[in-house]
Amino acid sequence: MALKALDYDTLNENVKKCQYAVRGELYLRASELQKEGKKIIFTNVGNPHALGQKPLTFPRQVVALCQAPFLLDDPNVGMLFPADAIARAKHYLSLTSGGLGAYSDSRGLPGVRKEVAEFIQRRDGYPSDPELIFLTDGASKGVMQILNCVIRGNGDGILVPVPQYPLYSATISLLGGTLVPYYLDESENWGLDVANLRQSVAQARSQGITVRAMVIINPGNPTGQCLSEANIREILKFCYNEKLVLLGDEVYQQNIYQDERPFISSKKVLMEMGSPFSKEVQLVSFHTVSKGYWGECGQRGGYFEMTNLPPRVVEEIYKVASIALSPNVSAQIFMGLMVNPPKPGDISYDQFARESKGILESLRRRARLMTDGFNSCKNVVCNFTEGAMYSFPQIRLPTGALQAAKQAGKVPDVFYCLKLLEATGISTVPGSGFGQKEGVFHLRTTILPAEDEMPEIMDSFKKFNDEFMTQYDNNFGYSKM
């Protein structure tokens, strides 16, 4: 048969190289089992509403009115919606050129970008320029836009933390770049060692790779740690000395579960460092409506802010953004509402504060329940989830399991996670999908299942793990820590 213009053999090699473990083999098998009638608990993706988190009322009211502006003319609208939601809907509609169905500026609505800049200034105490803020279809799209500008070919390297969120490895592969790993220290609660960074850069350069940028994920995904101010300062100095663009993935900044180490933005630390750092270090920071107590993953709202990028570079990024014409307009309004929520004295404030506080307090309790649950299991060790939405326990696998995985043609942690899925319906992501040190195995699960279901889920995991360890324990030891 004649070769088709597009088949697997003629596919772009970069497409074939890119992998995204969060929706990989485990997810596909979980979907098959669900179709067969098995109850599946999808803890593989940070997707709060899919696991029962209720949407915040106020933003849904505002966007509902924006989607159906004829309701604003209904004489009964004041009986169905609070006055502040009505006022905000009118405000956002006034920013558009024809409602939510009309394209916006390719950078996003100027009025919403102004709200984002004001939010950043309140958070950090330093000015923010709306002209250097682009609204995007989720933070992921923004990350892809910036990496597309940084990566010129496979000779360009991006420093990425390992374990890492596979958005980065997949996008770098897709764009034809080279991922340069730097390993986080699990024994130090996934801390970052600058000496390790220097070693990673030196090794990459010895192989002819030009390291162009560095990624930090704060709070961490999948590792759940919060970077200290001192650590961020070290990173910024490192980027200054090595002339690297810093990409600050800060999408989990609302998800903080301990008081000792609050979220501090890279922009704030950079500005506090003063000249020459504050004038020279190039920083792009990302945020989203998908995480925190909003959890509006399906809305696809995000932004990035650029610091110290030359005007001509910003113009080129704008040009490329213009190819897609406009980010999702309703998502832009969600972003405006996230950075400018109801304030004390507003009609909707009490309900908004009650709902958001309730979600965060429940997430904090669930983080503790899951950490304690994992640490009660045989051959499982888990650092406390300081932030984000995930637990990342290490599983010490018996040598019998390593042998069985090899015979099955599976990576050991994939083998374990598949067995867990088949036995319990819990769909996780194997640590190998995020990168890990050789011979060490993990899995990632979200802390998002309903709080009242968490004890049963952890009991189910413990029962499976005990049986797995017994079945494959051949008295020849376990994988290393």
Curated annotation (Swiss-Prot):
Q: Is Nucleotide-binding a UniProt keyword of this protein? A: no
Q: Where is this motif: Peroxisomal targeting signal?
A: 479-481
Protein name per the record: Glutamate--glyoxylate aminotransferase 1
Alphabetized UniProt keyword annotations: Aminotransferase, Peroxisome, Pyridoxal phosphate, Transferase
Report the locations given in the UniProt record. Peroxisome
Q: Which EC class does it fall in?
A: transferase
Q: Please tell me in which tissues this protein is expressed.
A: Mostly expressed in leaves, and, to a lower extent, in shoots, stems, flowers, seedlings and green siliques.
Q: Which GO terms describe its biological process?
A: glycine biosynthetic process; L-alanine catabolic process; photorespiration; response to hypoxia
Q: Which residues carry this modification: N6-(pyridoxal phosphate)lysine?
A: 291
Query: EC number(s) for this protein?
Result: 2.6.1.4, 2.6.1.2, 2.6.1.44, 2.6.1.-
Q: Assembly and partners?
A: Homodimer.
Report the protein's function: Catalyzes the glutamate:glyoxylate (GGT or GGAT), alanine:glyoxylate (AGT), alanine:2-oxoglutarate (AKT) and glutamate:pyruvate (GPT) aminotransferase reactions in peroxisomes. Required for abscisic acid (ABA)- and stress-mediated responses in an H(2)O(2)-dependent manner. Functions as a photorespiratory aminotransferase that modulates amino acid content during photorespiration (GGAT activity); promotes serine, glycine and citrulline metabolism in response to light.
Q: Which GO terms describe its molecular function?
A: alanine-glyoxylate transaminase activity; glycine:2-oxoglutarate aminotransferase activity; L-alanine:2-oxoglutarate aminotransferase activity; mRNA binding; pyridoxal phosphate binding
Q: Which reaction does it catalyse?
A: L-alanine + 2-oxoglutarate = pyruvate + L-glutamate; glyoxylate + L-alanine = glycine + pyruvate; glycine + 2-oxoglutarate = glyoxylate + L-glutamate
Q: In which pathway does it act?
A: Amino-acid biosynthesis; glycine biosynthesis; glycine from glyoxylate: step 1/1; Photosynthesis; C4 acid pathway; Amino-acid degradation; L-alanine degradation via transaminase pathway; pyruvate from L-alanine: step 1/1
Q: Which organism is it from?
A: Arabidopsis thaliana (Mouse-ear cress)
Phenotype of gene-disrupted mutants:
Reduced growth. Loss of alanine aminotransferase activity and increased light sensitivity alleviated by addition of sucrose and rescued by high CO(2). Higher H(2)O(2) levels in light conditions. Greater root growth in low water potential and upon NaCl-stress.
| Family classification | Belongs to the class-I pyridoxal-phosphate-dependent aminotransferase family. Alanine aminotransferase subfamily.
Q: Which co-factor is required?
A: pyridoxal 5'-phosphate
Q: What induces it?
A: Down regulated in the dark. Slightly induced upon low-oxygen stress in shoots.
- This protein's superkingdom? Eukaryota
